[in-house]
Every structure is written in C-alpha cells, then in structure tokens.
C-alpha cells in the first residue's frame, strides 16, 4: 500500500550572498520498490517567496480554499476569551449548598422586583475569585464568563445588600445549619474579635459607629469598627457581630452568648476563647447558663498562672522529648498545663538569638557614649538611655533588661528573674475549663483549634479583602462585612472539600485557566470552553461541581 501526503514545501537555495526560498507543492510517499522507504517528489514549482510576495501568496491560499468551498466568512473567528473555570467552581459550590434558596427562605427577596439572592451569589463569587468594589464588579463581569444572570445595575447590587442585611438575624442560623449539616457536632464554638479601619472621615456624625480604639492592625490613627466572629472547630463561621470601634473585647461576650442562645439550637456548648476576653464576670455568666468554657491563661504578669505552674513545674520531665500534660483542680475549675520540649527548645533558641543581637547593639551604643568619634552629634546619657529603651521596646525585649539612668550614668543589666521565668514557661500552655471528664490532651487540642479563627481573620483581610471598605453608611458597611463573612463560609466549606488536594486560592488560580471562547462561524456565535486538564477535572470532582459543559448557550451568557 502506498501512503501519499501532500504539503507545501519551502526549499532554500543559496546563490552567492543571496538566499532564495522556493515555494513548492510536494508529496511524501512510501516507495514499495525501495522497501517502503519514505520518498518526496515535487509536484509543482510556484516560484520564490520573495518573488511572489505576501499578497500573491494570500491570493493563492484563498484560491485553494475556494476550490473546496471554504470562504473567509465560513472560517471560525475567535471574538473573545474570558475566564470561566473558577467562576464555574465557586458558583457551583454555592449552588450545591443551595444557598440562594436558604436566603430566599429567610425572606431576602421581599418585595424586590429583582432576584436579590442571585445578586448576592454574584457578590460572594466575586469576593472569592477577584475581590473588588461593587462598582468595579460591573467591569469585572466584562472579563469573566458569569452565566447565571445578566449584567446588573449598580443600584440593584446595593439594594441586594440592603435586603441581605434586613434578614441577617433569620438567615445566619439557616446558613449555619446548611453549612455544617452532618459534618461536625456543634458542641464547641470559638469566639474572637478583630478590627478593620477606614480611610478618610467622610460622612462621620457624632454617633457614628466608626470610632478610635485598639487597632489589631496597628492603625491607631484611623477610625475603625470591631467585628466578633463565632466559628465551629472546622473554622466555618456561624454568625458575626459588629460593634463600635471603641468597644472593649470582654464587653462583647455577654451579648454574643445571649445571641447564640436565642438564635441557634445548640445543646451542650463549650465556649473557647482567650482569658483576656473571658473576664470573671463573663465566666460567671457562662457558668450561670450552664455553658462550658475553655480559656487560656497568660503565663506572664499573672499571679494565678505563676502559682499553678510553680506547683506543677517539678512534675515535668525536661529530658523527655514527648509532649506532657499535668492538671489540677481549684474552686471547681480544672487547669491543664501542657509542655512541649520541642517548642521549648525552639523558643529558647530564638530568644537567645534576639538577646545576642540586642547585647551587641547595646555594647556598641555604650561604646559611642563613652568614646564619641567627634563626628556628628555627640551622644548624651539621656539620649542613649532613650535609644536603648526604644530599641528594646520595639524588639519586645524591654522586660528582659533593667535600663536605668542615675546621675547621668547609664546602667543596662539583664533582668535575671524575668529570664528565669521565661526558661520555666518555655513550651508551656495553661488552660482552664469546666470540663472535668475529657482527657487533658483533648482539652488542650480544643483550645489550639482556636487558631483556626485566626486563619479566618487572615482570609477575611487578605484573600477576601475585607478592607478597603468602599462604603460610607452604617448599613452598607454592615452589609459589606456580611458579604465577606458569607464568602468566608463558602471558602471554608470548599477548603474542607479540597483538603489534601489544594488550598482554595490555589484551586481558584488553577481553574481560572479554563476560558470560554466566543466563536463566530458562518454568522452564528457559540461559546466553547478550553479543554480541562486532569488536575482541573480532579478539583471540580472534589468540590462535587458538575463538569465543564461542552458549550454554553447564548441565553446563559
């Protein structure tokens, strides 16, 4: 059998200093007379590429196409290519949980003439995929393929936010039941607060809830609000609360406890938080309501912690590398002290390094005070004293040194008592609890799970861009925070599905590479996705989202 393949060939020939490219029509075949060896023969010489020119070559191509009935109009034209895969995945996760129905059950639609739940879905998908302002979202829709609804008006987006805020009290318990259904037992809730600040002073009134207060972002020069978040042990938010920016942490706990009791059908609940937030009054409130708690006690500048640890310190085997636990009971309160030799060594080494750098810096500063170089400003004892204190304070080392200035003489010595106590508590954690039955290891583990809420704050502030806030009225600010918390809820649900495969931000970036191309063929338009890779298919399968469709109809775009 003879196999023949025809093709265009460019043969190069050099004559003197010139290179000629000859355009030929050739065919390759296998010659049976030569043992089916491959051969090439020239069917036609069309001239040189330089002699024909670009225009003649294009006419030649067009003529060959006409010979088989192909016209420029019948060729496919790619009109646009927009991001799609991440939109499909995040929107599919929302749909799998049927969150639009949950919001409608809560009454989000009301008497609105538009589908408020669909617009909230859009806002949440945008917050996870490409967070931006509500106004910028309209431009974002031009760069992605969002198939579930048409282009909304900015006015309708804001009204959808208003509708969401109106049903917050009803919607949060319904959303919580949907998000945690069958996945975990709700006997443990974590509570923590953070703050977010605002740029500028627009529209501020005397009773505005944006106030100056303790800033977790270190921006004490900015007005802020305080946000309290109640989470499950898997890091899924149950509800959130917003307080004026000058609210003290521990004053929020009572209101949150009352809210959890009234809105969430929780049986035996253990409240987990930091001791600074759970004041004695708050602990009494929890005990009075027969709610349990697990709290961590500060190990420095706390006489009670010092008393408990001093009584248990001899129980720990410092030569044993395994994690150790010891406990005690006082006034119907159980105290568990955990000790990790590995963490102790790590903390001790890090502190020694910081102290070594500080000692070297202090030595150099004191040398310059004793023997000025004669250049620049001459150091003074008071100025050097201030510099040393500022350096130690900024490096969180001031408590380890005694810095004194007496009769213009600077004295810097180590605080041996403070360092000895640091050596004692390195690698230790002390928690108090009402749980008298669980193993010590489980008590400590439950408290450590509080770190999950810290990761939640980081997601809100970085990945989901809680800040900057492009709203200036209280109700819109509250609605914006609710949208961000909804996005965090969905992101945490997706994270659980993707565990061991990829993080949610990584999955979003991988799936973003799936594009939807808008093709025009013969005057008709169609929307075709790029082929999904094995990795992309695995991510969609893990999320339980339907595969990418072969094409999208015009009315869904």
Residue ranges and their predicted role:
Residues 1-80:
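Nucleic acid-processing catalytic cores of prokaryotic defense/repair systems
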Residues 52, 56-115:
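Accessory, often N-terminal, substrate/partner-engagement and coupling regions
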């Amino acid at each position: 059998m003879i196999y023949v393949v025809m093709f265009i060939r460019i043969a190069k020939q050099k004559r003197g200093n010139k290179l000629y490219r000859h355009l030929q029509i050739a065919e390759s075949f296998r010659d049976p007379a030569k043992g089916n060896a491959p051969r090439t023969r020239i069917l036609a010489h069309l001239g040189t590429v330089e002699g024909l020119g670009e225009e003649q070559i294009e006419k030649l191509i067009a003529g060959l196409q006409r010979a088989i009935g192909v016209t420029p109009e019948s060729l496919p034209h790619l009109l646009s290519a927009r991001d799609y895969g991440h939109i499909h995945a995040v929107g599919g996760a929302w749909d799998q949980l049927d969150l639009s129905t949950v919001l409608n059950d809560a009454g989000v639609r009301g008497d609105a003439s538009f589908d408020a739940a669909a617009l909230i879905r859009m806002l949440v998908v945008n917050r996870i995929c490409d967070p931006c302002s509500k106004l910028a979202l309209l431009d974002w829709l031009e760069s992605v393929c969002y198939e579930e609804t048409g282009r909304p008006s900015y006015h309708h987006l804001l009204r959808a936010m208003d509708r969401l805020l109106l049903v917050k009290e009803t919607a949060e318990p319904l959303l919580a039941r949907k998000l945690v259904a069958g996945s975990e037992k709700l006997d443990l809730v974590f509570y923590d607060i953070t703050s977010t600040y605002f740029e500028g002073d627009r529209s501020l009134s005397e009773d505005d809830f944006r106030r100056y207060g303790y800033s977790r972002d270190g921006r004490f020069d900015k007005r802020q609000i305080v946000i309290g978040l109640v989470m499950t042990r898997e890091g899924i938010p149950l509800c959130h609360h917003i307080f004026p920016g000058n609210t003290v942490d521990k004053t929020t706990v009572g209101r949150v406890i009352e809210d959890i009791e009234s809105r969430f059908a929780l049986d035996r609940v253990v409240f987990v938080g930091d001791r600074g937030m759970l004041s004695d009054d708050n602990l009494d409130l929890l005990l009075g309501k027969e709610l349990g708690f697990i709290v961590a006690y500060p190990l420095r500048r706390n006489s009670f912690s010092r008393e408990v640890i001093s009584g248990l310190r001899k129980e720990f085997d410092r030569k044993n590398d395994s994690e150790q636990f010891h406990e005690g009971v006082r006034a119907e309160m159980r105290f568990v002290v955990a000790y990790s030799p590995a963490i102790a060594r790590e903390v001790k080494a890090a502190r020694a390094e910081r102290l070594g750098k500080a000692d070297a810096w202090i030595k150099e500063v004191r040398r310059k005070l004793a023997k000025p170089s004669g250049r620049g400003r001459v150091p003074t004892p008071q100025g050097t004293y201030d510099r040393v204190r500022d350096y130690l304070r900024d490096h969180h080392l001031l408590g380890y040194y005694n810095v004194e200035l007496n009769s213009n003489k600077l004295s810097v010595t180590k605080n041996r008592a403070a360092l000895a106590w640091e050596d004692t508590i390195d690698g230790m954690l002390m928690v108090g609890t009402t749980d008298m039955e669980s193993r010590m290891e489980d008590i400590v583990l439950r408290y450590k799970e509080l770190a999950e809420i810290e990761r939640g704050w980081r997601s809100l502030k970085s990945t989901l861009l809680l800040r900057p806030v492009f709203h200036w009225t209280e109700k819109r600010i509250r609605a914006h925070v609710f949208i961000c918390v909804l996005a965090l809820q969905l992101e945490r649900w997706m994270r659980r599905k993707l565990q061991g495969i990829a993080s949610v931000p990584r999955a979003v970036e991988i799936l973003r590479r799936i594009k939807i191309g808008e093709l025009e063929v013969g005057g008709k338009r169609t929307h075709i996705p790029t082929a999904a890779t094995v990795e992309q298919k695995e991510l969609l399968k893990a999320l339980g989202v339907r595969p990418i469709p072969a094409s999208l109809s015009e009315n869904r775009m």
